[in-house]
Curated annotation (Swiss-Prot):
First-listed, main subcellular location of the protein, grouped into a coarse class: endoplasmic reticulum
Record keywords: Amino-acid transport, Endoplasmic reticulum, Membrane, Transmembrane, Transmembrane helix, Transport, Vacuole
Organism of origin: Arabidopsis thaliana
Name by which UniProt lists this protein: Amino acid transporter AVT6E
Record has Plastid as a keyword: no
Amino acid sequence: MDSSYSVISKTSYVELQKPTVNGKPRNKLLPSDEESFVNDFDDARNGVGGEDADDLDFDVADYPLVHGKSSNQGSGIYGAVFNLTTSIIGAGIMALPATMKVLGLVLGFVLIILMALLSEISVELLVRFSVLYKSKSYGEVVQFALGKTARVLSEICIIVNNGGVLVVYLIIMGDVMSGSLHHIGVLDQWLGNGFWDHRKVLILIVMVIFLAPLCALNKIDSLSVTSAASVALAVVFVVVCFVVATIKLIEGTIDPPRLSPDFGSKQAILDLLVVIPIMSNAYVCHFNVQPIYNELEGRSPHKMNRVGRITTAICVVVYASTAVSGYLLFGKDTESDILTNFDQDLGIRFSSAVNYIVRIGYILHLVLVFPVIHFSLRETVNTLLFEGSPPLSESKKRSLGLTVVLLALIYIGSTMIPNIWTAFKFTGATSAVSLGFTFPALIALRLGKQSNSLSFVERSVSWLMLILAVVVSIVGTIGNIYSLESKSD
C-alpha cells in the first residue's frame, strides 16, 4: 500500500519540548505532573525534606532530560583516584620520615592512620554538601554555609597552601639536582661543578621545558595519565626504601629507632609542636575534590566516596611504608627532605645506582604532580580575581596569562625559602589545616543543621575535627614562632 510517509533515519532524533514560558524556551522534557522531581531536589537543597535529604545519592547533572544538556564523558573511577592520590602524595611524603624521627615510630604510625581517617571523613562530608547545594567549587560550598567573607578566606587559604606546596616542589628539585649546603647534587656527581648545576638556572629550565606545558592544560581530566605515572614513580620510591631498610635490618646494621617522642630538651619539644601541622598537611587534597568530582563520569556522592576511600587506603600504605623505612634507614640523621639523604653510601650493593633511581624517579614524580596542584591554584585565583567571568576553558588568553604569572611567582618564592621544613610547618599550621578540617567541619555543622542530615556520630566527629584544627593551628603557630626566635638567638 502506497504511503506519503517516509522512513526516518536511525541517526535522526526528535526533541520534544513544551512551549515557551514567560517568553523563555523550556529545556525540560518532563511532563507537568513530574515536575515534582525537580522541586523535591530543590527542597532538599534548601534544607526542606528533613531526613530525605540524606538519601540523595545522585547528581542531577547526570539527568540531561532535566537540564536539557547531554552528559559529557569524564574520567572513570581510577582516573579520579590517580588525580586525587597525586593531589595528596607530593612533597609531603618527603617530610614524613623527619616527623617520625621526632614523634617516634608508635605515635607517628598512629597519627598517620588517625589523620587519614579524619581526612577521609571530611572529604565525604564536603562531597555530600557540595552535591546537596549544587556547588561547583570549594569556595561555593563554603559560601553557602558561612557567607561570602568565609568564601574569600577559603580561597586565600587554597592559594597560600597550593602556592606553598608548589614552592616546596621546586625547592626539592633544586636540592636534589644541584645540591644543598650539606649534600651534593646529582648533576655535581655526574658532570662536576659548573654553570649547569646553578640552582636558580636549573629550576627555571625545568619550569619552562617540563612544567609550563603541563600547567597550560585546561582540564584536570587531561592529567589522569600523568597522575598515574606519578603514582607509579612514588610507589617505586617506597618499594626501594622498604627493600633497602629490610636488607639492612636483616643484616643488623640499623640503629634502634626511637619508639616515642623525646621530651629531653627545649628543641625536641619545639620540634614536636611543629611536626603535628606537618602531619595534618599530609592528606590535604580538598581543594581538588570538587574539580575531580565535576569531571567524574556518571558522578554521584557514592562514586566519589569510593574514589576517596581507595585513595586514602593507597596513601596510608605509601605514607606508613615511607615514614618507617626512611627513618629506619637514616635514623637521627634523617633530613627534613629525605631525598637529600640519598647522596651517601647506603651500605648495600649497587648503592650508587639505587641512589640515582630514587632521586631522579622522585624528581620526575614531582614534575608530574606539579600541574595537578597548579590546576586548582589557577582556578581559585581566577575565581577570586575575575568573579563572574567565563570559565578558563573558554578564555585561553586569560588561562595562559594566569599560568605565566603564577609560575613566575612560584619560581621567585622557591629562590627565597631555605628548605621544605620551613614551608611545610607554616602552611600546615595555617592554610592546610583550615582547608582539610576547619572549613569542612564548619560546613557540615552549619548545613547539616539546616537540612537535618547529620547523624549524632557525624556531628560529634565534625566537632572533634573543628577542635583539633583550632588546637593544631594555635600550637603549631606558637611552635613555629618560638622555633624562629630560638634560631635567631
